[in-house]
């Protein structure tokens, strides 16, 4: 987090916006504890550091639409000044449902690859 803070100070000085990704924002494949509270805790820390854009990453593609909806609704309500983004890994069968869940929950920033 010290590095995030240093980068944020540079961004502020040079009129840039830092984007920080919360990897494994929807689950942890290594058996470590995971829940909404952990994501909220790190989001709160990033907000304290004045990070303006936070992207939630489904690094391993395990997020379900209801989980995506719940997380974005909760975070957007608690941190209205933050621009939240989604970095979702998926397959053609589940991608639309995941994107719609994030969008319908207030997320308006999406990463994509072609």
Please report, for each region that a protein language model flagged, where it lies by residue.
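Beta-strand segments within the central parallel beta-sheet cores of soluble alpha/beta enzyme folds
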Residues: 85-89, 113-114
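Glycine-rich phosphate-binding active-site loops on the catalytic face of alpha/beta enzymes
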Residues: 58, 107-114
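Alpha/beta enzyme core
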Residues: 1-18, 24-86, 93-105
């Amino acid at each position: 987090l010290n590095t995030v803070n240093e980068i944020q100070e540079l961004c502020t000085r040079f009129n840039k916006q830092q984007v920080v990704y919360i990897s494994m924002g929807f689950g942890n494949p290594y058996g470590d504890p995971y829940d909404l509270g952990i994501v909220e805790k790190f989001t709160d820390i990033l907000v304290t550091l004045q990070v303006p854009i936070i992207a939630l990453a489904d690094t391993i593609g395990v997020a379900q639409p209801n989980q995506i909806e719940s997380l974005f609704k909760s975070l957007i309500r608690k941190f209205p000044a933050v621009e939240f983004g989604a970095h979702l890994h998926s397959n053609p069968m589940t991608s639309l449902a995941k994107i719609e869940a994030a969008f319908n929950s207030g997320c308006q920033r999406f990463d994509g690859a072609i």
